[in-house]
């Protein structure tokens, strides 16, 4: 927790890292959930996007020591881990090389969480499940992109995405950390297929808004409420025009 950090680190703006696949990589686009998060924590935390389109958890393991080296200079406040959409690609279909068996997926997530915790024991880690799949939307997207060469059989199904989502939630319970079941949450809304998914997999602005709300909710339920975090430097209203240095003495000197 921030209150447990040494005084020197308290004065540094903490980091929130978004780690995941293309759904994270695209999160800083207009209307993206990462951009919304950065706006919410403006002047209070740095929101960093570490999203890698097409990646599964197996490939993500190779990035851990580069993205989360031991002995980080800046404190990690929180890390979201948002994988599974590619792991759940069906074996023997067009996205076969991205497929990771669900048992391995769960263990890979465990390794990611353990490494992040080793880097920063007080960090808030939140697992996010893969989103639901609109199979008709995926097929329509493939036809519009590849024409007659488009896949005839689905490369992802909503049923399989649900299998991976449940393992993600189960692991979070085992580790005693937070999770966000986006797969279930989105399907609570009638017409979710077109409302939340742009191509049957990736998120519309409305879909991004769901993720943003859920992440901010979980952060606030834990200990990372933006409303309760101080600005990194004084608000302009606290600065005396005749003696500006006074406002900076406690935080900056």
Model-derived features with residue positions:
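Alpha-helical cap/lid subdomain in secreted, periplasmic
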Residues: 2, 6-11, 32-46, 59-253
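Catalytic nucleophile-elbow at a beta strand-turn-alpha helix junction centered on a G-D-S/GDSL motif
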Residues: 13-29, 53-56, 86-88
